[in-house]
C-alpha cells in the first residue's frame, strides 16, 4: 500500500491511523500489513468485482470537500454492483494525493470513506497510496456476492422485452449544470444528486428475480441502453416522453424552447446512477417503462412525439 517515494514512517503511520480502522477487523485484510488480502470462498455464491476511478476536475469540481469525494467514489462503484444484483462486502482503494491535499484533507477523505463503508456494510481490504503532480485521482475496486449464476449481465435482453429505468433521470446532469452556475437550484437538491448519488442496492432482489439484462446509468441513459443493445445483439427503442423526472427536472424542462432536445439532454447527461433493465412481461415496482427491445442493433430514440437523432449518447473520456 505505501509509496516508496514518500517518507516511510509518515505514510505507514497515516495508513495505520486513517485506513486500518476501515478494515472492520476482517481477518483477510491482515490489518493492512501484508502485500495482499485473502477473500475466502463462499459456498453457492459468485464473487462480483467492479472498478471505477474518479479524477478531480472531471468527476467532481475542484475544491470539493474531501469526505464527499470519498463517498462519491464508494457510491459510483456500488452502483455497478447494484446493477449486477450483487451484495457488497469489501473493497480495495488506490489513491494519488496531489501536493495541495494536506493532512487534514487526507483525514477528511478517510472519514468520508469510512462513513460510507460502514453504511453499506463494506470493509477496506487493501490498496495503495501514492503522490502525484497531477489532479487528485482515486479508484476503488468493489467486491460483492451474488448467488451462483445469478449476476444480471448486460447480455441477456430478448426481443419483445420491456425496457425500464429506476428512479428519475437527468438530475445528475442538471446538478452538474447547477454547480457550474448554468442553471438555478434554489434548494440544492439537484446539486445533492450530483455530488452524492444513491446506489440502487434496494433493487437487488427484483433484478435477480425478474430482469433479463441490466446496467447502471452512469454515462447517460442512451449510452447505457446502447451497452445493453450491443451486448445482447439487439435494438433498444426508447421513448423519452416516458422518462421519470423529478419535480426540479420537470420545472427545468417546462422552461426549455425545444422539449424534444431538452429530453435528449436529460437522457444523455449521465451521473444518475439509476438502473436501466429489461424485463419479459410486466414492469416491477420501482421501475418505469421507457421502451422495448426488438431485433436489430443500436438504440432508437423518440422525444416529443418524433424520432430524434442522438449524436452522443452520453459521456465519453476518449
Residue ranges and their predicted role:
Residues 173-190:
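Short, compositionally biased
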Residues 1-68, 93, 112-117, 121:
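Extreme N-terminal cap/leader segments of soluble proteins
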Residues 1-21, 98-125, 131-138, 143, ...:
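Glycine-/charge-enriched secondary-structure boundary and capping motifs
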Residues 66-90, 111-119, 206, 220-231:
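Small-aliphatic-rich amphipathic alpha-helix that forms the alpha element of a beta-alpha
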Residues 47, 54, 89-178:
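Glycine-rich anion-binding loops of enzyme active sites
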Amino acid at each position: 500500500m505505501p509509496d516508496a517515494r514518500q517518507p516511510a514512517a509518515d505514510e505507514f503511520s497515516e495508513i495505520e491511523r486513517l485506513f486500518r480502522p476501515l478494515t472492520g477487523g476482517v481477518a483477510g485484510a491482515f490489518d493492512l500489513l501484508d502485500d495482499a488480502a485473502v477473500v475466502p470462498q463462499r459456498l453457492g455464491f459468485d464473487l462480483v468485482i467492479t472498478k471505477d476511478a474518479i479524477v478531480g476536475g472531471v468527476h467532481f469540481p475542484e475544491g470539493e470537500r474531501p469526505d464527499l469525494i470519498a463517498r462519491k467514489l464508494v457510491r459510483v462503484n456500488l452502483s455497478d454492483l447494484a446493477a449486477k444484483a450483487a451484495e457488497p462486502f469489501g473493497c480495495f482503494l488506490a489513491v494519488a494525493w496531489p501536493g495541495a491535499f494536506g493532512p487534514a484533507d487526507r483525514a477528511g477523505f478517510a472519514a468520508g470513506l469510512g462513513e460510507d463503508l460502514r453504511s453499506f456494510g463494506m470493509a477496506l481490504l487493501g490498496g495503495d497510496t501514492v503522490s502525484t503532480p497531477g489532479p487528485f485521482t482515486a479508484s476503488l475496486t468493489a467486491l460483492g456476492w451474488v448467488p451462483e449464476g445469478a449476476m444480471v449481465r448486460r447480455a441477456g435482453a430478448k426481443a419483445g422485452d420491456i425496457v425500464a429505468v429506476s428512479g428519475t433521470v437527468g438530475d445528475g446532469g442538471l446538478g452538474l449544470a447547477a454547480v457550474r452556475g448554468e442553471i438555478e437550484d434554489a434548494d440544492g437538491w439537484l446539486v445533492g444528486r450530483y455530488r452524492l448519488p444513491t446506489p440502487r442496492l434496494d433493487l437487488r432482489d427484483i433484478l435477480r428475480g425478474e430482469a433479463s439484462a441490466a446496467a447502471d446509468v452512469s454515462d447517460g441513459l442512451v449510452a447505457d441502453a446502447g451497452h445493453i443493445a450491443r451486448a445482447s445483439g439487439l435494438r433498444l427503442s426508447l421513448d423519452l416522453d416516458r422518462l421519470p423526472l423529478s419535480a426540479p427536472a420537470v420545472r427545468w424542462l417546462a422552461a426549455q424552447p425545444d422539449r424534444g432536445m431538452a429530453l435528449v439532454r436529460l437522457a444523455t447527461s449521465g451521473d444518475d446512477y439509476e438502473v436501466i433493465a429489461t424485463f419479459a412481461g410486466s414492469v416491477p415496482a420501482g421501475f418505469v417503462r421507457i421502451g422495448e427491445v426488438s431485433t436489430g442493433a443500436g438504440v432508437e430514440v423518440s422525444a416529443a412525439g418524433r424520432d430524434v437523432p442522438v449524436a452522443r449518447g452520453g459521456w465519453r473520456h476518449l
